[in-house]
Amino acid sequence: MKKELKILIIANIALLISIIHYTFDLLTLCIDDTSKDALTDEQLNPPNGFNSTFYESPPQLIPKIIHQTYKTNDIPEQWVKGRQKCIDLHPDYTYILWTDEMSDTFIKQEYPWFLDTFRSYEYPIERADAIRYFILSHYGGIYIDLDDGCERRLDPLLKVPAFLRKTSPTGVSNDVMGSVPRHPFFLKVIKSLKHYKKNWYIPYMTIMGSTGPLFISVVWKQYKRWSNTAENGAVRILQPADYKMHNNSFFSISKGSSWHTGDANFMKTLENHILSCVVTGFIFGFFILYGEFTFYTWLCSGPFNNKRYYIQWLSDKFKLHKWKLTSSYKNKEKRRNPTRHEYNSRGKRLRKDSNIPYDSVFLDIEKNHAKFTDLT
């Protein structure tokens, strides 16, 4: 095998390992259908209800608190009905609407180590995302987005230590979540926020990856892989049919997203044109392979075979440049601070009004002049 081909193969393997390392959690999301962690129909809709003498109801774990967030107390009209329905269905629950001012004060008092990061988020929705993780970890309860309205009581969801909901096409979402106080998963979530605070230049991707559903999906995969998820550390997943649009669903969705902007609509358009995205991906991959082929032919070409010559040439150039700089510096130092011997060895100017030393440079006439060196 040619040496150039070995170099190309090693470089590709190193690149592939690096890509897999940084995207491993995203790749595993594609093959995780959440079925092992799903809340079952028996848990959510027991036969004859929880009060049946034939069914022993599990104990309540999550406290009866409903959390929601908004900028102020003035809720947009399209979300008022859904919010009020949640309150009316749960008169025995504590309801808290977290405004921006309340959220900032809470972080400042309870989690001052995160305050600078919290205030430095570029988009308000990132702060709205972050605060929900902190309040669930601190107080426990159920968090519900304002565009999610309640369709039935949430009591069955209180029987597990923590839950998220499955989203499409893969992963979990953060619009409906529940937890006991200080659940290990949400402790990991709040500790991971600083690490994932990155600007991806596209607002949709920045929000999704720093605090949104993509962020919590990645942390969830890491938690499942490295943590003890048995018993009280478990995180159960609410399936789409139990979430909305079915007879026994817990929630309904109101019109009007709470944060999506123009680039989000673009991403949604891509989702609806999967085939076009796949074709574009293949075209992009072709150009990458063509670029690698071009690079390989360059490696095998004549100029690169003389690489030792070019490396030596560059090395000599560098050494010469370094020597010139060093010599120039030393000469300047000598002129600036001559030794006594150097000072005395210099000639004197012939003018009486000037005694400044100078370097005497005289031609040896007898050796250099043609008139005196011609012995013929």
From Swiss-Prot:
Show the GO MF annotations.
Answer: inositol phosphorylceramide mannosyltransferase activity; mannosyltransferase activity
Give the record's subunit note. Heterodimer of CSH1 and CSG2.
The effect of disrupting this gene, in the record's words, is: Exhibits a reduction in the synthesis of mannosylated sphingolipids.
**Species name:** Saccharomyces cerevisiae (strain ATCC 204508 / S288c) (Baker's yeast)
Q: Tell me any Pfam family this protein matches.
A: Gly_transf_sug
GO-annotated biological processes: glycosphingolipid biosynthetic process; mannosyl diphosphorylinositol ceramide metabolic process; mannosyl-inositol phosphorylceramide biosynthetic process; sphingolipid biosynthetic process
Naming one, the record's GO cellular component terms include: vacuolar membrane
Give UniProt keywords alphabetically.
Answer: Membrane, Phosphoprotein, Transferase, Transmembrane, Transmembrane helix, Vacuole
Similarity field: Belongs to the glycosyltransferase 32 family.
Miscellaneous notes: Present with 195 molecules/cell in log phase SD medium.
The EC number(s) this enzyme carries: 2.4.1.370
**InterPro entries from the UniProt entry:** Glycosyltransferase_domain (IPR051706), GlycoTrfase_DXD_sugar-bd_CS (IPR007577), Nucleotide-diphossugar_trans (IPR029044)
Compartments where located? Vacuole membrane
Chain positions covered by the region annotation Disordered: 331-351
Q: Which principal EC class is assigned to this enzyme? A: transferase
Q: Which SUPFAM superfamilies match?
A: Nucleotide-diphospho-sugar transferases
By what name is this protein known?
Mannosyl phosphorylinositol ceramide synthase CSH1
Q: Which reaction does it catalyse?
A: a 1D-myo-inositol-1-phospho-N-[(R)-2-hydroxy-very-long-chain fatty acyl]-(R)-4-hydroxysphingoid base + GDP-alpha-D-mannose = an alpha-D-mannosyl-(1<->6)-1D-myo-inositol-1-phospho-N-[(R)-2-hydroxy-very-long-chain fatty acyl]-(R)-4-hydroxysphingoid base + GDP + H(+)
Q: Which Gene3D superfamilies match?
A: 3.90.550.20
Keyword Acetylation in record: no
Q: What does this protein do?
A: Involved in the synthesis of mannosyl phosphorylinositol ceramide. Catalyzes the addition of mannosyl to phosphorylinositol ceramide.
